């Protein structure tokens, strides 16, 4: 008797792999185990639910039952895997032990919230899943004043979307400029200026000392003594890969679950996919690399070993006040910039100061068409 391929997780990576695999193999049994309800949705859509006046159910593309039927999989929902026995090739759930032929870890990531002082830290909202949004949506709808902690991509997108839906928004970060991992300060300041003109308040270069509740208000105390009064506090301070199961199973783990070019972990029959996986030395949190990895792994498990090749990928920021597309390396002291501006926006090219080679680029507004010729000039990764 052959055992099924078991997938742990039901996010984009897991479902993309299932759909890709089913195009190649309609017969191998697949069992998916997920801690949530298994509904198929697009996580990036969480960044603009407020301006679109959407609730959680609006984001569901396909129910868990519909997905399972369409792709001929067994779907076990609202269930946690408690242990993996790599030697026996089993996973434990509740009072059952299931045997796999191959195992795919698509356990995703969790929102990082530092251990702040104060009595209201358990009231901080994160929006890293449909389930989290569903739990918080009533508070978010009724809130008028919202403080967003973290001015990276997700925090900036959420702050802009909240302000677009007429909320009073304060965006906080210990960095001195917004989008510090994506934009050089002189371009980050342009996004900040536009957001400020649209009503967003900024508290940059400031840490958080405490978060407390006082009657109906949440009070965010900054390290300079300033206090921000809010109805709701959202943390968008980065993600951490869910690697606990992999660690318990004895797999090699760094920032994510370490995989080779075939998405194979340190165990020959266990693979990892999505933003729990560390491929070519990095955790990949964006859609395109996850999609390419899922397609390659589908071919590998269907019988044709296929290494993952990652061409340079375009990141499209959901910042409608200043639409941005970027790729490659766009921050660092080793970069020098060449910028062309016109009424359509700007094209900013980053060159390595020593080699003069193109390292990355950022295009704004209607200059998006300039991105694709530049994208072809950037190196990819993998075979």
Pin down the residues of each PLM region.
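FAD-binding core/adjacent interface of flavoenzyme oxidoreductases
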Residues: 1-6, 62-145, 221-223, 227, ...
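Mid-to-C-terminal Rossmann-like scaffold of FAD/NAD(P)H-dependent oxidoreductases
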Residues: 2-4, 276-370
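Beta1-alpha1 glycine-rich phosphate/pyrophosphate-binding loop at the start
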Residues: 2-73, 161-182
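Glycine-rich Rossmann-fold phosphate-binding loop(s) that bind the pyrophosphate
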Residues: 9-12, 128, 150-152
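Rossmann-like dinucleotide-binding cores of NAD(P)H-dependent redox enzymes
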Residues: 60, 154-210, 290, 308-316, ...
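A conserved short coil-to-beta-strand element within the FAD-binding core of flavoproteins
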Residues: 77-88, 204-216
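FAD-site-proximal beta/loop scaffold in flavoenzymes
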Residues: 120-141, 221, 226-299
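A short, polar/charged loop-to-alpha-helix boundary motif
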Residues: 367-381
